[in-house]
Design a protein with these regions (language model features):
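Basic, Lys/Arg-enriched alpha-helical interface segments
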Residues: 2-98, 107-108, 120-156
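Hydrophobic/aromatic beta-strand elements that line small-molecule binding cavities or substrate pockets
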Residues: 101-103
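Active-site beta-strand-loop-beta-strand hairpin of nuclease catalytic cores
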Residues: 105-113
Length: 156
């Protein structure tokens, strides 16, 4: 009840509208029975992501949240060379710079962020070979971690 009294004093403020939106979204999510998968960040991907400009973090964060609830954001595209839609890339432009985050949804109970980087234009839109090799190594690390997490889950 105190929440209603407090919110009533806000009038039509942006904060009230945002809380109303979150409340409705949470209710819909709970009623749908959807679960939110945890996000695991491989090695430096979280630190690298946090260095992106705030608007880029916001946009990519929302795309990752959609992956957590089993949806695919419109800006998420399969990364070429990884055989299908198991490894996806989010691309965001900001003030003339391009930022990318690569994640995988190939695991039933988790989303792994494999790499986050600012694209340096050396070869057009193509992802540099060094980054692709790094993503492959980190995907293997994610597979190993997921296997360990599954074994822990079976043991408990």
């Amino acid at each position: 009840m105190s929440l209603l009294v407090t919110r009533a004093g806000w009038g039509n403020s942006p904060a009230k509208e945002w809380l109303d939106y979150l409340w409705c979204f949470r209710h819909i999510l709970e009623m749908s029975g959807a679960t939110v998968k945890p996000v695991s960040w491989i090695t430096s991907s979280y630190k690298d992501f946090r260095e992106f400009p705030d608007p880029v973090q916001d946009a990519m964060g929302y795309a990752l949240y959609q992956a957590q609830i089993g949806l695919k954001h419109g800006s998420a595209k399969p990364l070429k060379g990884f055989g299908g839609a198991g490894v996806l890339e989010i691309v965001a432009d900001h003030v003339g710079d391009t930022f990318r985050a690569v994640y995988t949804v190939k695991f039933a109970t988790a989303v792994y962020v494999l790499h986050a980087f600012q694209k340096k234009s050396k070869s057009g839109i193509k992802t540099p070979t060094e980054d692709l090799e790094l993503i492959r190594r980190r995907l293997k690390a994610a597979e190993a971690d997921y296997k360990i997490q599954l074994e822990k889950g079976k043991a408990s």
